[in-house]
Structure formats: structure tokens, C-alpha cells
């Protein structure tokens, strides 16, 4: 059973979640694989439309492939919405790469101890070719 947190603890958790999300988005924008992976641990889980990724090595492989696409010239990314409450962050975004149009993407992050413990991703992706 989860204990009730006082307001200061809730604010601290929210601030940590905000910091982790800001770092994650900054590293994603720079296509920085090492920086992105600093947000995950071997206990992290990442739910994608293609299945569950468990641990930092599986998540690293996912981002390595994604970053190959996102580092090509002409990439654009727009963050449409960001909500943070306690240990949970939610974002909605659009992006375009040389290969695909991400008409909408959404991620949810659960942050514990300064790391992303759980992440979900879903999106509507249309190939350009």
C-alpha cells in the first residue's frame, strides 16, 4: 500500500520527474544516445507497439535504430503537450524525418530515484515513401 506523501515530498518527486524529462528531451533533441541512456537502468521497462523492452540494453538498441532515422537532415520535432504529476510525466508530440511522418506521438514516463523506471510509447507513423 502506498503511503500518503506530504506536499514537500510530492513537490520534490515532481521536480525530479521534471528534471529527468528535461534531460531526456534535451538528449533526444541532440540525438545523444549515451545521454539518453543515462536516464535508464537495467530495471527499466519500455512498452512500445512492437512489444515490451526490458533493461537498458534492449532500450539502447531501440534508441540506436530510432536515432539513425532522427539524425538524418531535415528532421523536425514539436512538443505539443507536457504534463507532470508526482513521478509521472506525459508528453504529446509530432515529428517528421526523411523517412516518416509522426503525425502524433505520445509517451508516458514513470520516474523513480532519478531514472525512468517505466516508459510507454504510441504513435501514428506514416511512411513517406
Mark where each language-model region is:
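A beta-strand edge to alpha-helix "cap/lid" segment located at domain peripheries
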Residues: 2-12, 26-29, 47, 60-129
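Short, solvent-exposed loop/helix junctions and linker helices
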Residues: 14-15, 53
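Solvent-exposed, amphipathic alpha-helical segments
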Residues: 16-27
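Short, well-ordered alpha-helical segments enriched in acidic and aromatic residues
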Residues: 30-43
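Conserved short acidic donor-positioning loop in nucleotide-sugar-dependent glycosyltransferases
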Residues: 31, 50-51
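Glycine-/small-residue-rich active-site loops that bind phosphorylated ligands and cofactors
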Residues: 51-54, 97
Amino acid at each position: 500500500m502506498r503511503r500518503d506523501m506530504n506536499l514537500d515530498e510530492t513537490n520534490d518527486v515532481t521536480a525530479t520527474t521534471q528534471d529527468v524529462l528535461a534531460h531526456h528531451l534535451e538528449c533526444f533533441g541532440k540525438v545523444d544516445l549515451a545521454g539518453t541512456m543515462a536516464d535508464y537502468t537495467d530495471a527499466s521497462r519500455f512498452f512500445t507497439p512492437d512489444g515490451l523492452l526490458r533493461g537498458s540494453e534492449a532500450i539502447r538498441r531501440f534508441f540506436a535504430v530510432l536515432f539513425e532515422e532522427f539524425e538524418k537532415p531535415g528532421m523536425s520535432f514539436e512538443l505539443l503537450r507536457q504534463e507532470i504529476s508526482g513521478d509521472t510525466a506525459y508528453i504529446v508530440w509530432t515529428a517528421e524525418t526523411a523517412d516518416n511522418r509522426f503525425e502524433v506521438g505520445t509517451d508516458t514516463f514513470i520516474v523513480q530515484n532519478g531514472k525512468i523506471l517505466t516508459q510507454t510509447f504510441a504513435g501514428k507513423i506514416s511512411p513517406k515513401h
